[in-house]
Amino acid sequence: MSSREIRIATRQSALALWQAEYVKARLEQAHPGLTVTLLPMTSRGDKLLDAPLAKIGGKGLFVKELETALLEGAADIAVHSMKDVPMDFPEGLGLYTICEREDPRDAFVSNTYASLEQLPAGSVVGTSSLRRQAQLLARRPDLQIRFLRGNVNTRLAKLDAGEYDAIILAAAGLIRLGFESRIRSSISVDDSLPAGGQGAVGIECRTADSDLHALLEPLHHSDTALRVTAERALNKRLNGGCQVPIACYAIREGDQLWLRGLVGQPDGTQLLRAEGRAPLAEAEALGVRVAEDLLEQGAEAILEAVYGEAGHP
């Protein structure tokens, strides 16, 4: 990296490119004269579209190739959806910036029905997420949940082709890509607790690049970072990746954080819930504490069964 050039490693999906372009624009706005270029690449998770994420196994399905580009010096920063970022980083890399969060909720999308409540019994609902599946079936065990992978455009096309009565997507992705009008209703966090980091964009770079860290500082949103720190600490304590039925969501209440966590049986027959509050400075400890509460309720057995089916630890 020259002092006036930054190369961004990004996935090639429309949403990933939107996020990278957003970071590019913010950097150029903050630092006139800075040159920012995109380096699009395909991740393992993008290539394996014919199986549910939980069955592919492994963590970092959507980030490993980007991290390799950082380690080899081909790129200077990598832009990620925070819900895809593993808890641990390769030696020499770290997460230095978390941008302001978009709407963290799940969105109900259908061409026929206005809300989840309106779906008739037996309706087919598409999702790639065991977290969404567990919470959907807990509320509506009469629904059929069918596997749905692919980028946002692909998923919408499958809905439009009549393969599903409704699909559930992250509201943030639809909003960012200009598909907000496709959202029939946003599902409250009480009814569908989001994935840790959902709606937030993170920037990863080499730990030794202190000059670069300073350039990224204007993009950092401290409130979002505190909330995501608590959520990620919960995920880490539960050894969770982006393809397990773990949900968590933190909000700031004055000088405190309120964190809610959930672990669910994929068939919706059991949802374990926990919550806690702590001062802002104790975000990480709060995440661990709420995770411990879930473990005491039996979360480990649920997660081990999911990992066992996926064929990985």
Curated annotation (Swiss-Prot):
Pathway: Porphyrin-containing compound metabolism; protoporphyrin-IX biosynthesis; coproporphyrinogen-III from 5-aminolevulinate: step 2/4. Tetrapolymerization of the monopyrrole PBG into the hydroxymethylbilane pre-uroporphyrinogen in several discrete steps. It comes from Pseudomonas aeruginosa (strain UCBPP-PA14). Monomer. The keyword Amino-acid biosynthesis does not apply. NCBIfam families: hemC. This is Porphobilinogen deaminase. The keyword DNA repair does not apply. The modification S-(dipyrrolylmethanemethyl)cysteine is found at residue 242. One of its GO terms (molecular function) is hydroxymethylbilane synthase activity. Belongs to the HMBS family. One of its GO terms (biological process) is protoporphyrinogen IX biosynthetic process. Keywords: Porphyrin biosynthesis, Transferase. One of its GO terms (cellular component) is cytoplasm. It holds the Pfam family Porphobil_deam. Binds 1 dipyrromethane group covalently.
